[in-house]
Amino acid sequence: MKLETERLYIVPCTEESIHVANEQGYNSGPHIVGHVENVKQDKDLLPWGAWYVIRKEDDIVLGDIGFKGKPNEEHTVEVGYGFIEKYWNKGYATEAVSELINWAFQTGEVEMIIAETLLENESSIRVLEKLHMKRMGTTETMINWKLEK
């Protein structure tokens, strides 16, 4: 399973891809390791967790994106993303998350995608705005977003 955009490959995180990312010095956080462990118990979880974003021109891992689990009863998933700082503000997050959102809506299992971002994270706010997500509300520290199919 692999998604592709003009500049990027987007691949689900697996034990093999973790090794490749780690060899490049990419810090695969606990959300990635935990997801790979969960997939060992339930292979259907694979696309509903972490995905690496890889630049086509040099096969470098730029960051990771993904969902925080399978769609719930309301056919909703939460999307999240994180990129190495030197790759910020180059459109990679918008390009990758847009492709992942399109994939999710095409599965027929998802009707709404939600996200949250820190109030002061202007780059992340711009990504969500470019993806046409709508602000649902705010807390003391976070803005909540949604995008309906």
Spans of features found by a protein language model:
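Conserved beta-strand-loop-alpha-helix junction that forms the acyl-donor binding cleft
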Residues: 115-125
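Conserved acetyl-CoA-binding loop-helix of GNAT-fold acetyltransferases
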Residues: 89-103, 125-130
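GNAT-family acyltransferases
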Residues: 1-78, 83-86, 99-103, 107, ...
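Short acidic/polar active-site loop segments enriched in Thr and Asp
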Residues: 111
